[in-house]
């Protein structure tokens, strides 16, 4: 709502590549990201650039995913694909992607190296839910996340793809309550001072 009427809230909104955008030095009083920072090719450079854009003493805040083992939305589909295909799948590590900052120590070190202070990483246990049908949810899981990556790695036949999809549908039915399909989730809520 605020973006559709920025004049009414006295705020400017900027959508840009934080790694390469030439920001006005200390031009912002706050930097916020919701699950976007994990995709930087060079996180150190990106966080340095963000820090230069935030007024001294002001904050950067973001949320990102905790480890795969604490996130059913990633782990459950991955396990399903591994069980059905037998594919060997290694965790993605620090490469750009949803779990790039799932290692708290690594995340903390990147922010400190980029010269942020008062780095705080809170662990938040929550859940994520969708009102999608079990079929639509299964289709989504076939296209994103760790299950999708394992599918790409396994390169299964159409018959095996259908088996995976049906397993996703069955899992969705087990998770569905009151019209919602839910997954346990753990995220990091991060704040750091420029």
What does each model-identified segment do?
Residues 114-117, 134, 138-143, 184-194:
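Core SAM-dependent methyltransferase catalytic element
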Residues 7-20:
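Conserved SAM-binding strand-loop segment of SAM-dependent methyltransferases
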Residues 19-30:
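A short acidic, Gly/Pro-enriched loop at the edge of an enzyme's catalytic core
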Residues 44-45, 51, 59-132, 148:
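Conserved catalytic/acceptor-binding region of the Class I
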Residues 120-178:
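C-terminal helical/coil "lid" or tail adjacent to the Rossmann-like core of SAM-dependent
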Residues 29-44, 66-68:
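A short SAM/SAH-binding and catalytic strip from SAM-dependent methyltransferases
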Residues 40-41, 54-56:
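Helix-to-beta-strand junctions that scaffold the AdoMet/dcAdoMet cofactor pocket
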């Amino acid at each position: 709502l605020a973006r559709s009427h920025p004049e009414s809230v006295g705020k400017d909104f900027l959508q840009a590549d934080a790694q390469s955008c030439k920001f006005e030095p200390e031009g912002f009083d706050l930097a916020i990201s919701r699950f976007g920072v994990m995709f930087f090719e060079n996180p150190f450079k990106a966080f340095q650039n963000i820090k230069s854009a935030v007024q001294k003493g002001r904050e950067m805040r973001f949320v990102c995913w905790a480890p795969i083992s604490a996130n059913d939305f990633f782990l459950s589909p991955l396990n399903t694909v591994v069980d059905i295909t037998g594919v060997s799948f290694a965790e993605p590590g620090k490469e750009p992607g949803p779990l790039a900052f799932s290692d708290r120590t690594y995340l903390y070190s990147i922010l400190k190296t980029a010269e942020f202070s008062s780095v705080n990483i809170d662990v938040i246990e929550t859940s994520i839910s969708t009102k999608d049908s079990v079929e639509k949810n299964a289709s989504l899981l076939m296209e994103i996340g760790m299950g999708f990556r394992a599918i790409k790695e396994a390169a299964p036949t159409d018959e095996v793809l259908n088996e995976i999809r049906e397993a996703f549908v069955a899992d969705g039915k087990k998770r569905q309550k009151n019209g919602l399909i839910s997954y346990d989730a753990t995220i990091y809520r991060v704040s750091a001072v420029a």
